[in-house]
Every structure is written in structure tokens, then in C-alpha cells.
């Protein structure tokens, strides 16, 4: 049963559902009694539902009262994940005209297409930013000023797109110059998941640094699900950034990454685990990677005080929690590799079956 806005007066239906303690007549009845419409109108809606469905629903409603913290009832509307996903795709269309469109866009119609798309994104993104500001209102901003602030932030964000495009061009250049398998820059934009991940991160970072809640993280987690690369919107990333293959790579919120940094799949730039998380919020927890660093697959670099010096190379599977000076080569020597000939293999062969 759904009880929509405008039906209830006084105590909302959602509040009544949260207070449910007993069986179906109590929980559903409490919600219905909170509504302005008479029970004679609303009760048949519930009574006519399959008994199994109502029983399962009531069990879930009771859990809403027992298990708090994961409900969002009676609060302001949160930004919509579905809407933000659609907006993000349209932002990619603005950043890479012609690459995310189903039909060819000719130069003669580019302005008409982009004006229409920009207008659509402006209105929809403003609505989502307004929801974000309602959810987490910046200090000193009155409720009556939220719509104006949302519009200004949206215009400001869209005004940053030319600068974001300049950064993305350096990323595409770095990918082309750093991967001999790349046949063209068009192939990189169309086929490399890294480009989508870094494009979304760079736009989300613009929202993040303006203090807009929820939306930046929704955007980058959407890209994470599509590309396998987890770039936090708070990370500050320089020019000519490239992550080859990119699957499983994680870059944390307070990372500082310099220019011309190249990484591979499975790299983690993370924070050290601690028992007192609250003391770490708002502080630098993730490493600094200086200019010209290369980090090979599977490397893990942790800690806010860890600095990887300019021009250093971090080998595969290295685990680092301390800084290294510029132009260092860090390799993992904990396990020796052994190559066996055919006879040695036969002597060591173990019959193993599942």
C-alpha cells in the first residue's frame, strides 16, 4: 500500500507505520487513521490484497519500527539515483559530443543540439541540487534561498565544463601515448572504461568542492558500477592521468595525485584501518602521489602521510604505508619466483581433484 503526499494530515502515514508494533489491522490501520480520507474508502485497497502479500508487507513494516537508521521517512526528498544517472549520461554527451549519441551530429546542427541538451540538464540538475541542499543545507543559507542557490550552483557547474574538457583531453592523450594497443583517440573515448570513470569523477569533483551532498558520490558510484574503477569525487587529480585496464582500482577521498601519473588495474590508494573513524573524518587519510609516478598492478599504498616522490615506480603487489623519496623503485621481494623444467614438474606434481 502506498500513501501519497497530500492524503495525510497531522501525523503522516509514514510516522504511523514506524510506530507499528502489532499485526496487520494495527499497522495498516494506524496508517489509514492518519489519513484525511475515510477508512471506508481506503481500507478496501488493503483488504482486497492477497493475504500472503499483506502478511509479508506487514512483517516488513514492523521491521521499519524495530530497525532504524536505514529508513528515510518524513524527511525531505533525496536526490534521485535514477535521475542523476540520466543526467550523468547527458553530461558525458556534453563533454564528448557525438560519442554518446545514437545518431550522427553534424557541425551545422551542433549548437542547436547542445543548447537543447544544456537546457534539459540545467533544469533537471537544478532540481537534484535543490534536493541536496534541502537534505544538507549549508550554514547561513536560509530555506527561502535554496532554489536560488541551487540554480546558481548548477550554472556554475555547467560553466566549469570547458575546463573539465581541457583536463579530459590530457587524460585521453596520456592513454594514447601510454598504451601501444590504442589505435586512435576515438577508440580510447569509445572503448576505454577509464575515460568514462575519470570524466564522471572530474565533473563530480566540481560538485564535491562546492559542498553539494550526495550527488557527487551517486555519480562516481554509478561510474564505478559501469567501469569497475572506484574514484572518489573528493580526490584531487592532476593532468595527463591514465589508469590502464582500470578494473579494481580504488582512489580514496583525500588522495592528491600529481600530473602525468600512470596506474594499472587493481591499485589501491587507500586509508589505514582504525578503530576511531570519527577522528579521521575531514582529515587527510589517503596518500599523495607526486608527478610522473607509475604504479603497477595490485600495488596498495595507504595513509594520509604517505608520499610517493616524483618520478618513482611502484612495482606490482607492493604494500606501502611509508613515504619513498623521488625517483625510487619499489619492488616486492618477499617471494622468490622459481622456474621448473619438465622433469622437476613431474617430481613435484600432486594429484589434486575436486
Where are the predicted features?
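Short Gly/Ser/Thr- and charged-rich N-terminal loops/segments
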Residues: 1, 14-21, 31-33
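Serine residues within intrinsically disordered or low-complexity segments
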Residues: 12, 27-30, 40
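Terminal amphipathic alpha-helical/low-complexity segments used for targeting or macromolecular assembly
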Residues: 42-221, 346-354
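Left-handed beta-helix
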Residues: 227, 232-233, 238-239, 244-253, ...
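Regulatory activation segment
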Residues: 278-280, 284-285
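C-terminal membrane-proximal segments flanking the terminal transmembrane helix
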Residues: 301, 339, 343-352
Amino acid at each position: 500500500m502506498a500513501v501519497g503526499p497530500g492524503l495525510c494530515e497531522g501525523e503522516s502515514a509514514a510516522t504511523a507505520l514506524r510506530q507499528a508494533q502489532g499485526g496487520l489491522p494495527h499497522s495498516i490501520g494506524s496508517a489509514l487513521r492518519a489519513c484525511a480520507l475515510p477508512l471506508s474508502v481506503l481500507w478496501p485497497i488493503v483488504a482486497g490484497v492477497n493475504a500472503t502479500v499483506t502478511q509479508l508487507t506487514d512483517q516488513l513494516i514492523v521491521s521499519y519500527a524495530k530497525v532504524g537508521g536505514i529508513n528515510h521517512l518524513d524527511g525531505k526528498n533525496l536526490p534521485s539515483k535514477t535521475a542523476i544517472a540520466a543526467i550523468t549520461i547527458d553530461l558525458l554527451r556534453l563533454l564528448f559530443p557525438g560519442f554518446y549519441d545514437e545518431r550522427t551530429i553534424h557541425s551545422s546542427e551542433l549548437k542547436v543540439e547542445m543548447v537543447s541538451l544544456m537546457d534539459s540538464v540545467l533544469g533537471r540538475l537544478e532540481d537534484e541540487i535543490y534536493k541536496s541542499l534541502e537534505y544538507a543545507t549549508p550554514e547561513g543559507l536560509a530555506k527561502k534561498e535554496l532554489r536560488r542557490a541551487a540554480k546558481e550552483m548548477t550554472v556554475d557547474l555547467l560553466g566549469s565544463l570547458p575546463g573539465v574538457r581541457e583536463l579530459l583531453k590530457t587524460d585521453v592523450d596520456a592513454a594514447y601515448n601510454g598504451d601501444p594497443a590504442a589505435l586512435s583517440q576515438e577508440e580510447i573515448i569509445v572503448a576505454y572504461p577509464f575515460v568514462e570513470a575519470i570524466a564522471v569523477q572530474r565533473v563530480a569533483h566540481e560538485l564535491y568542492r562546492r559542498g553539494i551532498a550526495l550527488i557527487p558520490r551517486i555519480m562516481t558510484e554509478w561510474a564505478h558500477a559501469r567501469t569497475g574503477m572506484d574514484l572518489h569525487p573528493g580526490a584531487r587529480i592532476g593532468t595527463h592521468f591514465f589508469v590502464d585496464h582500470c578494473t579494481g582500482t580504488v582512489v580514496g577521498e583525500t588522495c592528491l595525485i600529481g600530473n602525468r601519473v600512470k596506474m594499472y588495474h587493481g591499485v589501491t590508494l587507500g586509508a589505514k584501518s582504525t578503530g576511531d573513524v570519527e577522528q579521521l573524518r575531514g582529515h587527510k587519510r589517503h596518500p599523495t602521489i607526486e608527478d610522473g609516478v607509475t604504479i603497477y598492478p595490485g600495488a596498495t599504498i595507504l595513509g594520509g602521510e604517505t608520499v610517493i616522490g616524483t618520478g618513482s615506480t611502484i612495482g606490482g603487489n607492493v604494500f606501502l604505508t611509508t613515504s619513498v623519496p623521488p625517483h625510487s623503485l619499489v619492488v616486492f621481494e618477499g617471494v622468490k619466483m622459481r622456474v621448473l623444467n619438465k622433469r622437476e614438474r613431474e617430481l613435484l606434481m600432486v594429484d589434486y581433484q575436486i
